[in-house]
């Protein structure tokens, strides 16, 4: 099935229980991506387990264990079409310990829907997700003020939440004037695909119309091919099949490739997308590909595939610009948290704190600071504990952004501004 519409990867972000999965389920239902009889089956099953309101969210939660726990765990790729685009949803789980999934999910997204429940307004994770979306390079955002049915579609409450959100997104550099705020109810289907009489005071677009205001992402096809691996399968009769999303460049059948830092070479035998074989694939495409000459155990999640003649850069050390989101005390030289960069998760050490910056202007405030605390921006030198692929944001921004986590929370986020490459023996 060739799809002539441009493709967008869409992250759905926001605090736990604000209705992210229900919103995705409703979008898929309203666009015909989920047949009505399947929704009906989900509804019956949900009612029998005492979770009547979960009917649309269950479209996403098609894993048994998740259904019973009532939460969405791993990132689920689902697709639906609007008039202008076809979207692949990168569903970003909302529970506290899943922020790292949010990081790897958001780094694959071209745009995001921020879901905020009208009764609660801005919550802790709303802030964290907005900050991460911005740091990870998501420039396009639609804000869904959800659960309006729970506040009787009150315009005053909508305006209060909108004001709160306008301040929050302004702090991280989004321009509120360019962002659409939609009063809606995913559960009731209000303002998703058609205007609702419940909100006569609202004259703006529906959620689906708002998604079509996004600008088509530039496809960085002129850059070297890069694909961070999400999973590796071994399929009988076919062989080794890595899966991932192309970040830059063009992937072609017959191409000679290198996997780094595994330092393994192979050849692409076939490429599959949405269960159909393709001769080539472009940035933004989620693909599985069969590779000759590489065993399942030779490569793993976090490795990056690139052309054999321009392999991905493996860092010995790298220089980064970071913003500290929250740290219980202070970051000093020697601190070794976990860096989440594309699909890799690697412990890295702060070997030098070069300068503290003014987070708004980027001007240097202090040379060689002794520590960094929450709210500080800085230029730092980092040494990975084992080989990792990271690229300068000037060269390949998609592989230059990262989040730093420790003790189950996101400590900081940042980008790589220079790499001291490790010499790989070929």
Curated annotation (Swiss-Prot):
Keywords: Cytoplasm, Elongation factor, GTP-binding, Hydrolase, Magnesium, Metal-binding, Nucleotide-binding, Protein biosynthesis. One of its GO terms (molecular function) is GTPase activity. Coiled coil: none annotated. GTP binds at residues 14-21, 91-95, 146-149. Residues 185-187 are annotated as: G5. Residues 146-149 are annotated as: G4. Residues 91-94 are annotated as: G3. It catalyses: GTP + H2O = GDP + phosphate + H(+). Belongs to the TRAFAC class translation factor GTPase superfamily. Classic translation factor GTPase family. EF-Tu/EF-1A subfamily. GTP hydrolase that promotes the GTP-dependent binding of aminoacyl-tRNA to the A-site of ribosomes during protein biosynthesis. This is Elongation factor 1-alpha. It comes from Methanosphaerula palustris (strain ATCC BAA-1556 / DSM 19958 / E1-9c).
């Amino acid at each position: 099935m060739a799809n002539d519409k441009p493709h967008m990867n869409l992250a759905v972000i926001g605090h736990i229980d604000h209705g992210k999965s229900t919103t995705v389920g409703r979008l898929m239902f309203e666009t015909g991506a989920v047949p009505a009889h399947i929704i009906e089956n989900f509804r019956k099953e949900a009612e029998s387990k005492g979770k009547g309101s979960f009917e649309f969210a269950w479209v996403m939660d098609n894993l048994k264990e998740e259904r019973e726990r009532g939460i969405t765990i791993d990132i689920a790729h689902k697709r639906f079409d609007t008039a202008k685009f076809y979207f692949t949803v990168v569903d970003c789980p909302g529970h506290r310990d899943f922020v790292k999934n949010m990081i790897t999910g958001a780094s694959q997204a071209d745009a995001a829907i921020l879901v905020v429940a009208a009764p609660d307004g801005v919550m802790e994770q709303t802030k964290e997700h907005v900050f991460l979306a911005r740091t990870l390079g998501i420039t396009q955002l639609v804000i869904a003020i959800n659960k309006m049915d729970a506040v009787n579609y009150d315009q005053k409450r909508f305006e209060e939440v909108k004001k709160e959100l306008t301040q929050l997104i302004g702090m991280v550099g989004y321009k509120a004037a360019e962002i659409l705020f939609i009063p809606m109810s995913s559960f009731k289907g209000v303002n998703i695909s058609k205007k609702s009489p419940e909100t006569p005071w609202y004259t703006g677009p529906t959620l689906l119309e708002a998604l079509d205001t996004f600008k088509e992402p530039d496809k960085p096809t002129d850059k070297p091919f890069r694909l961070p691996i999400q999973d590796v399968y071994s399929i009988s009769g076919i062989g080794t099949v890595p899966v991932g999303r192309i970040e830059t460049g063009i992937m072609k059948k017959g191409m000679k490739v290198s996997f780094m830092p595994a330092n393994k070479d192979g050849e692409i035998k076939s490429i599959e997308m949405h269960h159909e074989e393709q001769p080539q694939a472009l940035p933004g495409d989620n693909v599985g590909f069969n590779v000759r000459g590489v065993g399942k155990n030779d490569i793993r999640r976090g490795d990056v595939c690139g052309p054999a003649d321009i392999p991905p850069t493996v860092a010995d050390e790298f220089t980064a610009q970071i913003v500290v989101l929250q740290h219980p005390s202070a970051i000093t030289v020697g601190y070794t948290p976990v860096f989440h960069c594309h699909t890799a998760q690697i412990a890295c050490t702060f070997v030098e704190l070069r300068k503290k910056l003014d987070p708004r202007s980027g001007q240097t405030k202090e040379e060689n600071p002794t520590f960094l605390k929450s709210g500080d921006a800085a230029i730092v030198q980092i040494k990975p504990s084992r080989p990792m692929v990271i690229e300068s944001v000037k060269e390949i921004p998609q592989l230059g952004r990262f989040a730093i986590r420790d003790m189950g929370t996101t400590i900081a986020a940042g980008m790589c501004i220079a790499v001291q490459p490790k010499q790989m023996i070929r």
